Amino acid sequence: MPGNKIGLLNVHHRVKLLYGEGLHIRNLTPGTEIAFYVPNNSTPQGDGVAVVMSGEKMKVIIVEDEFLAQQELSWLINTHSQMEIVGSFDDGLDVLKFLQHNKVDAIFLDINIPSLDGVLLAQNISQFAHKPFIVFITAWKEHAVEAFELEAFDYILKPYQESRIINMLQKLTTAWEQQNNAASGLASAAPRENDTINLIKDERIIVTSIHDIYYAEAHEKMTFVYTRRESFVMPMNITEFVPDALNIAASGQSKFLLTVAQVSIANRF
């Protein structure tokens, strides 16, 4: 596979290390694709790292203004994962500019960086339609609560042990794979291009993902709508609001909202 830096012998030895079986590799030409079939009852041995031979890699960026720290993290990612580092930055605004035109799956983020600190940067990123995983790696422990509120994947304090990073990389890879599998399942149901609904607050129209709506409550000729972060008062009764939500839910991508609309809508008398 072009650009793949994993040598065939290295792959062979790592599989042998994991499963205790030798595999014969011979007469391979450049570009040959190989697949390893491991019996279902095989159990990996030791602490080896399984090699996943797939065409898609997890795309990540590093945001760190200390050069040596940036290089160390880059080495750990390249050594202990199959992730592809598509950019390294030392300035928060540069990251926002990059993300306007590029999609990434995860961001390794320091907090004390120029122009826009890591917490503010994460708050901006949390508003994106595509929300990458965010892993804070910082010397500032006092921002852990904010990181939790932003639903960060992890919060790692400097100085860290290599094992801490390796463990995080493995968990992050698993979470990304599960996310992709879930997305593939939803795609087969032919989802709508935009799963959003317009809500009103302070005379402004707020375009909101229906996945953020978890509760709607009827009150006379108004409907109170609650999302994960805030609440809205819609100038319509609930029988007008619910069909809009159900029409979107009918696409197949919004089973959660369909359940909410059918079961969790309260009428106040």
Curated annotation (Swiss-Prot):
Record GO terms (molecular function): phosphorelay response regulator activity; transcription cis-regulatory region binding
Residue positions, PTM 4-aspartylphosphate: 110
Domain called HTH LytTR-type: residue spans: 197-269
UniProt keywords, alphabetically: DNA-binding, Fimbrium biogenesis, Phosphoprotein, Transcription, Transcription regulation, Two-component regulatory system
Response regulatory domain location: 59-173
Protein name per its UniProtKB record: Protein MrkE
Recorded name of the encoding gene: mrkE
Coiled-coil annotated spans: none
